[in-house]
UniProtKB/Swiss-Prot annotation:
Lineage, highest ranks first: Eukaryota, Viridiplantae, Streptophyta, Embryophyta, Tracheophyta
Protein's gene: PP2B10
CDD domains: F-box_AtSKIP3-like (cd22162)
Protein name: F-box protein PP2-B10
Biological pathway: Protein modification; protein ubiquitination
The entry's keywords: Ubl conjugation pathway
MF GO annotations: carbohydrate binding
Organism for this UniProt entry: Arabidopsis thaliana
Length: 272
C-alpha cells in the first residue's frame, strides 16, 4: 500500500478564531511548525502567510542583513531568502544565513578570515578563486609538514541560548596526499576556557581500531566537512565571548599537500 496523502481540511475548529489570535499563537512556534500548521486548514494556510508571524521568526536586527538592492513582497519571502542566500559581510570574508527549520543564525568564516600557519608564504599555501566557493578565494595547500588552522569569532553574531557545531569545509585535489591515516587534533571552545577536543581525519582511510576519529562527510554543495566540536552560546548581543576553533597536526610532521580549505562553518547542532 502506498503512503496516504495528507489532505487539507476544508474546515477546522479553529476557523471560528480571530485571525490575529491564530497568528499570535503560531508566532510562538518555529518556522517548521508554522509550515506544518499551514496544511491543517485553509484558515491556517492563509494566516501563516502573515507578516506578523514571519517577523517574529526573523532575528531582531534582520534589517542589517538585507542587501540594499533587494526588495521583498513579504516577511516570509525575506525569511526564506535569508535561509537560501547567505549574506556576505566583513569585507566579504564571512557569510551569515538562517537555518530554515529554526531561524537560528549560521555563520561561515572564509579561509581568508582564518589564521593559517605559513598561509602568507606561496611556497606552502596558494590563494586561488574557484567558482564553487561562496568567497573570493580559497586556500590551497601546496606543501607543509606543520599543519595548523585556527579561527575565531565573537558570539554576538550567533543566536543566543543555542548549541552550535563547528565544521571545517574542504576539498581534496587529485594529487592530495599526506592525510591518510593521519589524525588531526581539533578543538572548539570559549577563549580562556578549556575547549572540547577530538581527533579528526581529512581522509576516510583510517586504521582500524581508531573509532574515536571523526571522518569527513559529503555536503549537498559538493564540498566535504568534518565536525570539529560543539559549544553552547548562552549570551546575546551584549555578550563579548569569543569562540576559537582549531585543527592541527604538529607531531607526526609528514609532508601534506593538495587540500583546499573554503572555511569554517558554524550552525546549530543536531539534536539526537
Amino acid at each position: 500500500m502506498g503512503r496516504k496523502r495528507r489532505v487539507k481540511s476544508e474546515s477546522s475548529p479553529f476557523d471560528s478564531f480571530p485571525e490575529d489570535c491564530i497568528s499570535y499563537i503560531i508566532s510562538f512556534t518555529n518556522p517548521r511548525d508554522a509550515c506544518v500548521a499551514a496544511t491543517v486548514s485553509k484558515t491556517f494556510e492563509s494566516t501563516v502567510k502573515s507578516d506578523i508571524i514571519w517577523e517574529k521568526f526573523l532575528p531582531a536586527d534582520y534589517e542589517s542583513l538585507i542587501p540594499p538592492s533587494r526588495v521583498f513582497s513579504s516577511k516570509k519571502e525575506l525569511y526564506f531568502s535569508l535561509c537560501n542566500d547567505p549574506v556576505l559581510f566583513d569585507d566579504d570574508k564571512k557569510s551569515v544565513w538562517l537555518e530554515k527549520a529554526s531561524g537560528k543564525r549560521c555563520l561561515m568564516l572564509s579561509a581568508m578570515n582564518l589564521s593559517i600557519i605559513w598561509g602568507d608564504n606561496p611556497q606552502y599555501w596558494q590563494w586561488i578563486p574557484i567558482p564553487e566557493s561562496r568567497f573570493e578565494k580559497v586556500a590551497k595547500l601546496r606543501d607543509v609538514c606543520w599543519f595548523e588552522i585556527r579561527g575565531r569569532t565573537n558570539t554576538r553574531v550567533l543566536s543566543p541560548r543555542t548549541r552550535y557545531s563547528a565544521y571545517i569545509v574542504f576539498k581534496g585535489v587529485d594529487k592530495c596526499y599526506g592525510f591518510q591515516n593521519v589524525a588531526i587534533e581539533a578543538a572548539v571552545g570559549v577563549v580562556g576556557q578549556e575547549p572540547s577536543r577530538r581527533l579528526i581525519c581529512f581522509s576516510e582511510a583510517i586504521r582500524r581500531g581508531r573509532r574515536n576519529v571523526v571522518k569527513p562527510k559529503q555536503r549537498e554543495d559538493g564540498w566535504m566537512e568534518i565536525e570539529l566540536g560543539e559549544f553552547f552560546n548562552d549570551g546575546g548581543i551584549m555578550d563579548n565571548d569569543e569562540i576559537e576553533m582549531s585543527a592541527l597536526e604538529t607531531k607526526q610532521l609528514n609532508r601534506k599537500c593538495g587540500l583546499i580549505i573554503q572555511g569554517i562553518e558554524i550552525r546549530p547542532a543536531k539534536i539526537l
